[in-house]
Amino acid sequence: MKFAVVSFLLVALLGLVAVGEAQLKNLACVTNEGPKWANTYCAAVCHMSGRGAGSCNAKDECVCSMT
């Protein structure tokens, strides 16, 4: 029974982290600070999530690329 509860909590926590990361990734390129700051923030989000380098595209989306 404890295993089931711990497993459920772990899956729920991982789900929250994934949703939070997706929201950060979507908001990374929308800023009033300018494109240089947005690209730096996007690159940091991609790097911290283990997805390599990142940059903002023309649609203001943060795109991570494994290199």
From Swiss-Prot:
Transmembrane segments: none annotated. This is Antimicrobial peptide defensin 3. Keywords: Antibiotic, Antimicrobial, Defensin, Disulfide bond, Secreted, Signal. Induction: Not induced in 4th instar larvae following a blood meal, an infected blood meal, sterile injection or bacterial injection (E.coli K12 RM148 and M.luteus). It is found in: Secreted. Antibacterial peptide mostly active against Gram-positive bacteria with atypical up-regulation of expression. Residues 1-22 form the signal peptide. Disulfide bonds join C29-C56, C42-C62, C46-C64. InterPro entries: Defensin_invertebrate/fungal. Belongs to the invertebrate defensin family. GO terms for cellular component: extracellular space. GO terms for biological process: defense response to bacterium.
